[in-house]
Amino acid sequence: MSDNQPNQNQNTESDASPVAPRREFLTKAAAVSAGTAGATLMPRAVRGQEPEDGKLELVRIGIVGLGGRGTGALNDTLSINDKVQLVATADIDPAKQNVLGRLERKFGEKVLVKGGKNYVGIDAYKRVLDDPDVDVVLLTTPPGFRPQYLLDAVEAGKHVFAEKPTCIDPAGYRTCLEAHDKAIENGTAIVTGTQYRRQTNYIEAVRRIHGGDIGEIIGMTSRYCSNGIWYRNRKEGMSDTQYQLYNWMHFIWLSGDQIAEQAVHNIDFMNWVMGGPPESAYGSGGRFTRPDDSEMWDSCNVDYLYPGNRLVSFKCRQIPDTKSDNSNIIYGSEGIATVYGINRGAIITDRTGKELWSMKGDIGTAYQQEHKDLVDSIRAGKPIVELKQTAESSLTAVLGRIACYTGQDVKWDFLTEKSELNLFPENFDFNGSRPEPAHAVPGATKLI
């Protein structure tokens, strides 16, 4: 759970303080007791609770966020991995624990938490991080809280699976870089939910592209367009904050807008193909069909300029009754590669259209593979740490959002070196009020 949205009266991309309220709130919300903290500064294998070779036999899992994505992540890791066990959960909503019975019926002894270590509340995540029985924590809350949760998990000595995006503002990006470096120092793993990097047709297509099958990369187009997204009506008795957490996709301080929360998959693929993040972004878009209190735009069109003067034209859209398209087309000096989302596969042709290679896709296996890679790397004593690349992709999405919101040509270096944008509310109160939903206006919304 995390991020904040433009204040219409202030004409800025956020009404939040540019300082660091995210860390201050989360630190105050759940201070670690000295005794527990001392027990969790290092991974369990390092603390001598497992075989001398440092390899974990039973990998014990905790999760923060039991919504749809969290439940999906649990199904994936419990399905693909042997000798794993869910031992602790956290969520702000006690009703979310209803999923545990279904998981127990499906996975049996792999699920131990029913009636056990199930923590509820805004600070419940700390109880999972403080638990010495937890080796791996899955971070699957709305994105706004993710940067600080990541850093706290690493500081608690946990291995981490973190959903995308890992940040939705420059402040969160810097927190992610700090967590990345500390994980390497600690010897703890961080695997992220960018499943295209584990989908076989994507992997093979990129290998061939980088191997020269289409010649020199000239440019690219990418589309992440669908028919809409869920919306939840406010329930009687909810505070402003409770409602926004419940309907989190539609508030920028929590989701980062669709370009960050949803379309980051294609943006991550763009960076993968191009070898890193872009230099700048220039974009436009707007709101046409969203409910009045939704801060999300339903369309963004961004031109990303990558090193070597290579342009990537990116589009994301969520409008009912429109044509869906999830595709990436990479233009080379000698050929063209088209890589489709979900299960449609990939194809490479020469400049005349003659097929040179093709491959079917299977996204289902990719969802599970990321969890297998995480656990395998832990057991092998070679923990994967991939947070930096996902943080860069997440900030690339933020770069596009800010370019659209402000109407300016926004530089990567500005976000990484100068921007003070921090979207987390300065005074977070679970039972309190929030500013009226605000909508960015290009030309009026300012860079921070």
Question: Where are the regions a protein language model picked out?
Answer:
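N-terminal glycine-/serine-/threonine-rich beta1-alpha1-beta2 phosphate-ribose binding loop
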Residues: 2-158, 175-187, 445-448
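C-terminal helical cap and adjacent loop that interface with cofactors, partners, or active-site loops
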Residues: 19, 28-36, 47, 72, ...
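Predominantly a Rossmann-like dinucleotide-binding segment in NAD(P)-dependent oxidoreductases
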Residues: 65-70, 185-192, 196-294, 320-322, ...
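Short catalytic-loop micro-motif centered on adjacent basic/acidic residues
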Residues: 88, 138-139, 160-163, 190-193, ...
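Short, solvent-exposed turn/loop segments enriched in Gly/Ser/Thr/Pro and often Arg
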Residues: 93, 120-122, 142-146, 166-168, ...
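ADP-ribose/adenylate-binding Rossmann-like module
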Residues: 157-169
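Active-site beta-strand termini and strand-to-loop segments that position acidic
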Residues: 303-308, 331-333
